[in-house]
Amino acid sequence: MAAWSRTRLRWTLLDPRVVGRGLCPQGARAKATIPAALQAQESTEGPGTGQDRPRLRSPAELPGTGTLQFLFQLFLQGYVLHLPDLQVLNKTKYGPMWTTSFGTYTNVNLASAPLLEQVMRQEGKYPIRDHMDQWKDHRDHKGLTYGIFIAQGEQWYHLRQALKQRLLKPDEAALYTDALNEVISDFITRLDQVRAESESGDQVPDMAHLLYHLALEAITYILFEKRIGCLKPSIPEDTAAFIRSVAIMFQNSVYITFLPKWTRPLLPFWKRYLNGWDNIFSFGKKLIDEKVQELKAQLQETGPDGVRVSGYLHFLLTNELLSTQETIGTFPELLLAGVDTTSNTLTWALYHLSKSPEIQEALHKEVTGVVPFGKVPQHKDFAHMPLLKAVIKETLRLYPVVPTNSRIITEKETEINGFLFPKNTQFVLCHYVVSRDPSVFPEPNSFQPHRWLRKKEADNPGILHPFGSVPFGYGVRSCLGRRIAELEMQLMLSRLVQKYEIALAPGMGEVKTVSRIVLVPSKKVRLHFLQRQ
């Protein structure tokens, strides 16, 4: 009976008499679903319409899905936690450019490297991305200042100019090498404790969970110069509460994004979402307050000339680059960004190395050739480890931390692939789809780090398009913490491969992805760490 009801509902939702031509399952063009803001005028004037050029087409001529079909795909077909897979399906059906309508909004999806390049190279001084309304709803609800991830325009530019200090340049990131190595040493101690507790004496039952603790400890140490106990056998309760709150916030974000606002008082997702954010900001504010009090104590004791500028937040506060409210609005977001990028990427990298013993052995040989066993790698060593860098690049290609991004070009009309889009069109950049495009990456679903090495051979054509994989973004709105994240992953992977042989636990099978804004493993990744002699 239930199966019959689902089948009946499916055909009801897809019946053109119910949903109109824009939702036809065969992909009839969704002109009716394009709002007025996207109805580009087909006049004889404007860009690209001179006598010597073909007429630019209207966005209304693009194929795509309407609201009901999109909701059907999300909640009845189960794509709500697998949006990148839905984008792969839509590209196969519609081609590299299609629309998705949701309520009064219509987005233009771009799923090829040349299309991404066309949009990203037209960014202005203040690139606009998705407004992240759900994050703004929480900030507005609590009276918080917008942080770097949701601020736009001049406010975003001010935050960006302040926060890029001591982060963006490789030699600035190198300043954090000793701090990261200190945390990684503690992580390896904790790793050995977890291994010893396992039945086999060498297994880690949940690699992502353990690496999450590493990443949180590392980013907190960099931002606040404070250790918060993530790598101890017993984690402090406020730290554990923060970790739980991040998971709760992300899990409920998926439903908050796609359910209408009138459902918020009726369903549990909104309350859980708010509580998650409240705890995240409470944790961040506590760390900020402690650093402010520490700085005040130094000022009272030594005066302004005696203050020793050390860590990242200390530097920003001492130089008065951010107000108190801007600091409170931004630093909890930086904590989140610093955790998910490295922990998930390292998990995927170790998973694939465990499945690729030949690549792992080549990497071990490279690392120990530069840094023998017993020595700790330094920033300068990675200039001599091209395979290590290639492993990280290939992992980020297969699993971009944020599989989908967006841009809204507000200053002008935009010409993309023969179409003319009006100002304020939102372009969805399908990074996951693009980075698995066989025309850019042959055998796109296989783990092949050697494709990133400079030497081009018959079996290694190299990278065929520079925008095929841009996991840290592009231009002035690219990832602020890229250099820190790369350094942390290089240090972590090199030290693990130097000391252990990594093997996949029996019965693991294939690990798929789940999208909860960021891309995470669908199940616990169990690995064996075998001590090298």
UniProtKB/Swiss-Prot annotation:
InterPro entries xrefs: CYP11_CYP27_families, Cyt_P450, Cyt_P450_CS, Cyt_P450_E_grp-I, Cyt_P450_sf
Transit peptide per record: 1-32
Associated pathway: Hormone biosynthesis; cholecalciferol biosynthesis; Steroid metabolism; cholesterol degradation; Lipid metabolism; bile acid biosynthesis
Location in the cell: Mitochondrion inner membrane
N6-acetyllysine: residues bearing it: 142, 232, 285, 296, 375, 512, 523
Top-level lineage group: Eukaryota
Gene Ontology CC annotations of this record: mitochondrial inner membrane; mitochondrion
UniProt keyword Thylakoid present: no
Tissue: Expressed in the gray and white matter of cerebellum (at protein level).
Region (Sterol-binding): 386-400
Cofactor requirement: heme
E.C. designation(s): 1.14.15.15
Keywords assigned: Acetylation, Cholesterol metabolism, Heme, Iron, Lipid biosynthesis, Lipid metabolism, Membrane, Metal-binding, Mitochondrion, Mitochondrion inner membrane, Monooxygenase, Oxidoreductase, Steroid biosynthesis, Steroid metabolism, Sterol metabolism, Transit peptide
Reactions it catalyzes: 5beta-cholestane-3alpha,7alpha,12alpha-triol + 6 reduced [adrenodoxin] + 3 O2 + 5 H(+) = (25R)-3alpha,7alpha,12alpha-trihydroxy-5beta-cholestan-26-oate + 6 oxidized [adrenodoxin] + 4 H2O; cholestanol + 2 reduced [adrenodoxin] + O2 + 2 H(+) = (25R)-26-hydroxycholestanol + 2 oxidized [adrenodoxin] + H2O; (25R)-3beta-hydroxycholest-5-en-7-one-26-al + 2 reduced [adrenodoxin] + O2 + H(+) = (25R)-3beta-hydroxycholest-5-en-7-one-26-oate + 2 oxidized [adrenodoxin] + H2O; (25R)-3beta,26-dihydroxycholest-5-en-7-one + 2 reduced [adrenodoxin] + O2 + 2 H(+) = (25R)-3beta-hydroxycholest-5-en-7-one-26-al + 2 oxidized [adrenodoxin] + 2 H2O
Membrane topology: Peripheral membrane protein
GO annotation terms (biological process): bile acid biosynthetic process; C21-steroid hormone biosynthetic process; calcitriol biosynthetic process from calciol; cholesterol catabolic process
PTM annotation: Acetylation of Lys-125 and Lys-285 is observed in liver mitochondria from fasted mice but not from fed mice.
UniProt xrefs under PANTHER family: CYTOCHROME P450, CYTOCHROME P450 FAMILY 27 SUBFAMILY A MEMBER 1
Assembly and interaction partners: Interacts with HSP70; this interaction is required for initial targeting to mitochondria.
Protein's job: Cytochrome P450 monooxygenase that catalyzes regio- and stereospecific hydroxylation of cholesterol and its derivatives. Hydroxylates (with R stereochemistry) the terminal methyl group of cholesterol side-chain in a three step reaction to yield at first a C26 alcohol, then a C26 aldehyde and finally a C26 acid. Regulates cholesterol homeostasis by catalyzing the conversion of excess cholesterol to bile acids via both the 'neutral' (classic) and the 'acid' (alternative) pathways.
Protein name: Sterol 26-hydroxylase, mitochondrial
